[in-house]
Amino acid sequence: LEDTMLYLDSADTLRLVGIRGGDKDNVITKTAQAEVLTTGNGAQFQEVFEQMSAMYRRMYADADPGMKIVLEKTAVNKTESAISSPGTRKVCFILSQIPYGVQYMEKGGVRQSLNLGKVETTDKALTAVLGLRGNTPDQIQVLADRVSCFIVGTGGTPDIGDAYPSWPEKKNSALLDMMTKSYEDEYGISPEVLVIHGGLECGLIIE
């Protein structure tokens, strides 16, 4: 969504009225919407939007063939509630540059990641909720410090809530030994044992 807004604001004519996306902090958001005010030519804005929409459909034709970018016009005047053009650019900067995705890998597997789960504007303030994940408590803490540094650097206030528990590899596991032996007895070969970066409930069950 932020890339869409940046594209449409190439002439600095866009002002953000409101933005909303996602409903869970640990889920990659599938939909988002923004209400904007343009101070430029409406017909030209529509043309630029169509060009941008076609570009993104080409870019994500294989990865997301069902992608939809919809533009709806409204006759309601919301000039008074719109964020300034510089403020709109700042929101776009924050959403496009905030740490996101895989942050650290080891032995071919992901060990540290985060996602932007929810975002919304309320009373001209931007609220973003991120889900942090790490295989160890230290990895989660480092990630929290990094995100906090970014938020403070962009004029925001970080609020670190309860984190999902980490799920470090347990090298001495009676259950793993039993499952490995059962697999070897059944198939005559040793199983490939991996630590995956997923299933947050695993950490909750351990605790």
Model-based region annotation:
Residues L1-R133:
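Midchain, well-structured core segments that form catalytic/ion-binding scaffolds
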Residues D3-A11, V48-M59, R146-T154, A174, ...:
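Generic non-transmembrane alpha-helical segments
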Residues I28-Q33, A63, L130, V142-R146, ...:
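General "foldedness" signal
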Residues V70-N115, E120-D123, P137-V142, T157-E207:
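An extended, acidic, His-containing surface patch that forms the Zn2+-binding/catalytic region
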Residues V129-G155:
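C-terminal, non-catalytic macromolecule-binding modules
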